[in-house]
């Protein structure tokens, strides 16, 4: 009898924890609704609000990306979107995505990006005189860091992430 009660308590705890994570990611993914118009081919580039929200989600909730990292679908729950545009979202928004290897840590995915995650490559910056000169600081902003050259695997994460966001926005 004690073992049955213990099993029930553990099952309730585990189920409740999973619901909390899903609800958190569901809310996070639905916050990408400003990207829907772009992802359905309604515009040639994502809106500023889409990119801002996408960057915020990538920076604050990369664990939500892992829930869909292995998905190769271009539709969820009957909602279809342009897969090519979804794969291009990090580039179109100049947002660097976390490495997909972070999702393969046995469930121990960080809830924020590591402190040493690079934000881009050097770019020209205005000098005090107003002219442009090379700078040794990362380019882009904290909200919109530049994508690195080897982001093809990261694009898979983003595609999956955006796919779930689109589905959840409709539901």
Curated annotation (Swiss-Prot):
Residues linked to a glycan: 72, 82, 148
InterPro entries xrefs: Bifun_inhib/LTP/seed_sf, Bifunc_inhib/LTP/seed_store, LTSS
Main location: membrane
Region feature (Disordered): 113-149
Entry keyword annotation includes Membrane: yes
Membrane topology designation: Lipid-anchor; GPI-anchor
Keywords: Cell membrane, Disulfide bond, Glycoprotein, GPI-anchor, Lipoprotein, Membrane, Signal
Family: Belongs to the plant LTP family.
Function: Probable lipid transfer protein.
Protein's name according to its UniProt entry: Non-specific lipid transfer protein GPI-anchored 19
């Amino acid at each position: 009898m004690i073992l049955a009660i213990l099993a029930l308590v553990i099952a309730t705890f585990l189920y409740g924890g999973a619901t909390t994570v899903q609800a958190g990611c569901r809310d996070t993914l639905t916050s990408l609704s400003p990207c829907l118009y772009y992802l359905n081919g309604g515009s040639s580039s994502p809106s500023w609000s889409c990119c801002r929200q996408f960057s915020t989600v990538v920076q604050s909730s990369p664990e939500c990306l892992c829930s869909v990292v292995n998905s190769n679908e271009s539709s969820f729950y009957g909602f279809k979107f342009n897969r090519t545009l979804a794969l291009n979202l990090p580039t179109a928004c100049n947002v660097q995505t976390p490495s997909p290897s972070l999702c393969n840590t046995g469930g121990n995915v960080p809830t924020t990006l590591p402190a040493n995650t690079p934000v881009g490559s050097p770019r020209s910056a205005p000098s005090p005189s107003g002219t442009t000169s090379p700078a040794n600081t990362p380019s882009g902003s904290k909200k919109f860091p530049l994508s690195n050259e080897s982001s093809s695997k990261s694009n898979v994460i983003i595609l999956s992430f955006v796919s779930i966001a689109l589905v959840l926005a409709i539901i």
